[in-house]
Amino acid sequence: VEPKRYSALLVIFLKDLQPLGGLVKKVLEKKPESFEAYDDQTLKLALRFLPDFVKLLGAKNMISLAFQFLPEMKMLLFGGLPKLILLAEFTGDSEKEVGAKAKEAQEHIREFALRSRVTKNKREVEKYFSIRRQSFKLLHGHAKGLFAAPFVDDVVVKPEHLPEFLPRIRALMVPYQKQKKLIYTIAGHAGDGNFHVIPLMDLSKSSVRAVI
């Protein structure tokens, strides 16, 4: 199957996970090509190491790309970051077509009264996907002495149970992060409830190994 040439994203910012189950169902009614998600830990990494993240994107105009992160920086400074960012991708044969699909989906979820936006161009699409897909590489590059410890299996949870599941998995991980025994991110595919929990740890320390 030949992939469509154009794509646009409906980006949804969730500060409260309670609507997540119904929201996922509603978005899927518009048949997005993909429906991904990442947590606030992932977004914090991109903002914390913004210059290096921009380099990962291979951008020629670094200043221009950095300015694209102003909305996220404002959220961090004034309103706090969302707990989950959802990316619903719509593809088609023209920019006009994909933009219309994404805006139609945005209107379709208006009842949830959530903050959302539709990407305007290819660069914006790449920005959001890169946060999702390059975060582990970014984290690994800055977490000296820490290595991937995939002791948490990928999980598949029905979308309607995600508002209960995600806070519970975070509650398990956060105490160890505060003790500086691990760093973690959560990302995955909201449409089918498949999520990846990626911890980085220094397994040379017995106290850290005991966490596992």
Regions found by a protein language model. Give the residues of each.
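Noncatalytic alpha-helical scaffold of FAD-dependent oxidoreductases
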Residues: 1-212
